[in-house]
A protein has these predicted regions:
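Short, structured surface patches at the beginning of a domain
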Residues: 1-144
Length: 144
């Protein structure tokens, strides 16, 4: 099974998941930078610039990051578990979630074991690199 979906020599093209989330609480804090529309633009620009194709948006609007029982997230997670997604990209780690233990389990154990790369643009984290994988625990602690 292919584990990445960049344009270079890919035989089997896996989906690059572009995940967006906006909490009800976020609505009043920084509407412009955290809006779903803005997140989609940032994610699509990054994916295009870095050569990721076959992108698909997964969106949770008005859902807290303290739970992973979110419709868009669950759909993405099911596709990950079925081997359809090779990369997950988020604008920043807080968009992915705010629950430290589950975030760590997914980004440091589950995704690497399934060959899925996790990228957070703002924190410049890419778990396909040794440094990116090593930095994830520190970022998860900072999100508390």
């Amino acid at each position: 099974m292919a584990t990445a979906n960049k344009t270079k020599g890919q035989k089997e093209e896996l989906i690059t998941a572009l995940y967006c989330r906006l909490s009800v609480d976020d609505d009043n804090k920084d509407m412009e930078s955290n809006s779903i529309t803005n997140q989609k633009q940032i994610l699509s620009d990054f994916a295009r610039r870095e050569g990721y194709r076959n992108t698909m948006y997964f969106v949770d609007d008005g859902i807290s990051g303290t739970t992973f029982q979110r419709e868009g997230f669950q759909k993405m997670q099911n596709m990950v578990e079925n081997g359809l997604i090779g990369t997950i990209i988020v604008k920043d780690l807080s968009r992915f979630g705010r629950e430290q233990v589950e975030m760590g389990r997914l980004t440091q154990i589950v995704y690497p074991s399934l060959g899925v790369t996790f990228i957070s643009i703002q924190e410049n984290v890419n778990t396909a690199t040794k440094t990116g994988l090593e930095m994830m625990p520190f970022y998860n602690i900072l999100l508390r």
